[in-house]
Amino acid sequence: MTQFHQRGVFYVPDGKRDKAKGGEPRIILLSFLGVLLPSAVLLTLPVFSVSGLSITDALFTATSAISVTGLGVVDTGQHFTLAGKILLMCLMQIGGLGQMTLSAVLLYMFGVRLSLRQQALAKEALGQERQVNLRRLVKKIVTFALVAEAIGFVFLSYRWVPEMGWQTGMFYALFHSISAFNNAGFALFSDSMMSFVNDPLVSFTLAGLFIFGGLGFTVIGDVWRHWRKGFHFLHIHTKIMLIATPLLLLVGTVLFWLLERHNPNTMGSLTTGGQWLAAFFQSASARTAGFNSVDLTQFTQPALLIMIVLMLIGAGSTSTGGGIKVSTFAVAFMATWTFLRQKKHVVMFKRTVNWPTVTKSLAIIVVSGAILTTAMFLLMLTEKASFDKVMFETISAFATVGLTAGLTAELSEPGKYIMIVVMIIGRIGPLTLAYMLARPEPTLIKYPEDTVLTG
């Protein structure tokens, strides 16, 4: 029962005090750094690179791989040895599945039982609200990832083995399957996928991998459980993803085709079918995959703006992708639409979205904006580059996309460290950083309501 205090303060004695969650964000960050730092040291060893790698470039590359971003300061295919490429594959897989998932797998393999706190952290990282068998859940996630990558491997091998031979063709197929499913964007070809702009098999295989990886296991698992019952029985998050993903893909494809079809440096020289294929691939890749089949440095300004918007929206929650997340964008959009219609509740698919979810979505957008603004300001101080390049590269790093407008290869030493921090924040999540800095202190006190002049 709510009680009123004489000084205008409400006390809520029957509400349970939420525990501060300052520890969880630190665990997430420490688990990330626990993989990152040793990996960076390994990449500096001669066995992993052809001509050596500085500690800064090694740290940048390791961060890009574990955060599944794909930005590179060196040519991945030419600079790294076979051992280095295998290490990058492992880092991409770890980054895509997440440190919590991989930690649980290793502990279960060695027969170690997770504590209740560890199980709670793992379930939160995997987006599970209901009680689930964590061991079974982790097994399903890993199985799904391996099966998806295996399917991609078969299709890409069919394309590349006849051209490159069994050993090289199969290795390239494996590397790019892992990179695509985990939305990492690392490619062994110097021009990314530009050599295959007219290749439907390669384009659709890679696009399929990063679309499924971007949906997330939560969505795939929900569809698998309820596909016979119908759309109505799906979780609201699944419904948002199943509608928003193809919608964003369609809008991006049409806009890229309209804006670039007459550009001789990108899609202008392609056939109509080739233009649509390139537009589709770029639209799918923009939301965190990081591959490009056309030269992005030659994109028109309007097309780059569309690319930036798609990168920022990103993929699904608990997926291998980044960005502010599709569901965050959808909730914020519907909250705005609800306000404009002067309604009291945010309703999606005949379900009322609870207020904490709405405020969390708005907080993610505000915190993300603050981080991006700060990073862009710092990069404009350290780099001699135009504002549009700085904006594109910063958002690409924050959304863990990996697409580049040409700035990454020219970054100064301070600029590289700024981008490293941005990639880390983008992968662990902006609110994780905010929780660590703000130190949440839940209170039982409720003050009287008042109005603030806005707008």
Swiss-Prot record:
Q: Does the keyword Transport apply?
A: yes
Q: What is the effect of changing residue 290 to D/S?
A: Lack of K(+) uptake activity
Where located? Cell inner membrane
* Impact when changing residue 290 to A: Decrease in K(+) uptake activity
Its GO CC terms are: plasma membrane
User: Which InterPro entries does the record match to this protein?
Assistant: Cat_transpt, TrkH
Q: What is the effect of changing residue 327 to C?
A: Increases Vmax for K(+) transport
Q: Its membrane topology, per UniProt?
A: Multi-pass membrane protein
Q: Superkingdom of this entry's organism?
A: Bacteria
Ranges annotated as spanning the membrane? 27-47, 86-106, 141-161, 201-221, 240-260, 318-340, 362-382, 418-438
Intramembrane residues, please? 54-74, 169-189, 291-313, 390-410
- Please give one Gene Ontology molecular function term for this protein: potassium:chloride symporter activity
Q: Which UniProt keywords apply?
A: Cell inner membrane, Cell membrane, Ion transport, Membrane, Potassium, Potassium transport, Transmembrane, Transmembrane helix, Transport
UniProt-reported outcome of changing residue 317 to C: Increases Vmax for K(+) transport
Primary site of residence? membrane
Member of which family? Belongs to the TrkH potassium transport family. Ktr (TC 2.A.38.4) subfamily.
Function noted in UniProt:
Part of the Na(+)-dependent high affinity K(+) uptake system KtrAB. KtrB is the K(+)-translocating subunit.
What the record says about its domains?
Answer: Contains four repeated domains, each composed of two transmembrane helices connected by a putative pore loop (p-loop). Four conserved glycine residues in the p-loops are part of a selectivity filter for K(+) ions.
Which NCBIfam families does the entry link to? Answer: 2a38
Q: What else is known?
A: KtrB alone mediates slow Na(+)-independent K(+) uptake, as well as K(+)-independent Na(+) uptake.
Q: How does it assemble?
A: The uptake system is composed of KtrA and KtrB.
Which PANTHER family does the UniProt entry name for this protein? KTR SYSTEM POTASSIUM UPTAKE PROTEIN B, TRK SYSTEM POTASSIUM UPTAKE PROTEIN TRKG-RELATED
Name this protein carries in UniProt: Ktr system potassium uptake protein B
Organism expressing this protein natively: Vibrio alginolyticus
What taxonomic lineage is listed for the species of origin?
A: Bacteria, Pseudomonadati, Pseudomonadota, Gammaproteobacteria, Vibrionales
